[in-house]
Amino acid sequence: TRIHYLDEGPKDGEIIFLLHGEPAWSYLFRKMIPTLTSKGFRVIAPDMVGFGKSDKYISINDYSHQMHVDKMAELIIRLDLNNITAHVHDWGGLVGLRVIAEEPHRFDRVIASNTSLIATGRGFLNDLRSYILPYIFKLTIWLQGPASWEEFIGGNGFTNWIRYSRYADNIDVGGVMQTLGSVSEEERFAYEAPYPNATYKAGAQIFPYLIPSELRKNEMAYRDVFEKWDKPFLIANTDNDPVTGNNPQMVKSLKRIPTAQEIVIKGPGHFCLLYTSPSPRDLMRS
């Protein structure tokens, strides 16, 4: 499987690892990367499998949360990246935080924006929930059935987003970015460009549906790594995110990390990286 990634800035610079979410790709970081490289950082920004310029599996059954974790971890190991500052967004958090849990010695600090690592918590009942909830979730989506584009943009964003993406014949990647990110028509076409037709969009189609698929593994990442984390960890969410709905449970999960600090970015919506290009180190200092 071929993974496309950007490698910008001085090769001896401090490493910034930027990981996109759904349905974006590394093009999301086009405004942030020049700011970072101008300050001497080396920026690595991959496209996950099924997105951007990376290889794309045509069957939704070939995609899993663990597959994405494995591919991103393999990339970091092959590039032998160390002392990394990771900035993860949306699904980049669910994947990236699991990668960090598998290779914690390679990371020095983390910024998580409009994302979380969803887990049930400790205790017997919560352990039971981690096994049952994925099935309840799938049953709920099946019972509710497909959502139209109009339903998706009309409200109840998270549930309707999953129903739309899971059942859409041809998910409108550029349209999603334009709706949630207020991008121009030219930028809309740029986001859509890596996908000549619906066959190439299986990764984007199934990604939201996979969100609760590995709650148990997420929980073990907290217990084994993140509850013992002693390095800087910043939660940098926006105050106007229609996708997550600024769900306090998402922040509560990350607050299990002892060093976690939280700031709120005023104004931008879900794709906050389209509007701001701060230095991760500056964010950490704040």
Language-model regions, residue ranges each:
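Alpha-helical and His/Cys-centered functional microenvironments
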Residues: A24, G93, L274
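Conserved small/polar residues in nucleotide/adenosyl-binding loops
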Residues: Y275-P280
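Flexible "cap/lid" subdomain of the alpha/beta-hydrolase fold that forms the substrate-access gate
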Residues: R2-I3, E8, I15, L28, ...
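Catalytic histidine-centered segment of alpha/beta-hydrolase-like enzymes
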Residues: P268-L274
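Adenine-nucleotide cofactor-binding loop residues
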Residues: V49, G269, R281
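Conserved HGGG/HGGXW glycine-rich cap/lid loop of the alpha/beta-hydrolase fold
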Residues: E8-K53
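Glycine-/small-residue-rich active-site loops that bind phosphorylated ligands and cofactors
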Residues: A24, D241-P242, F271
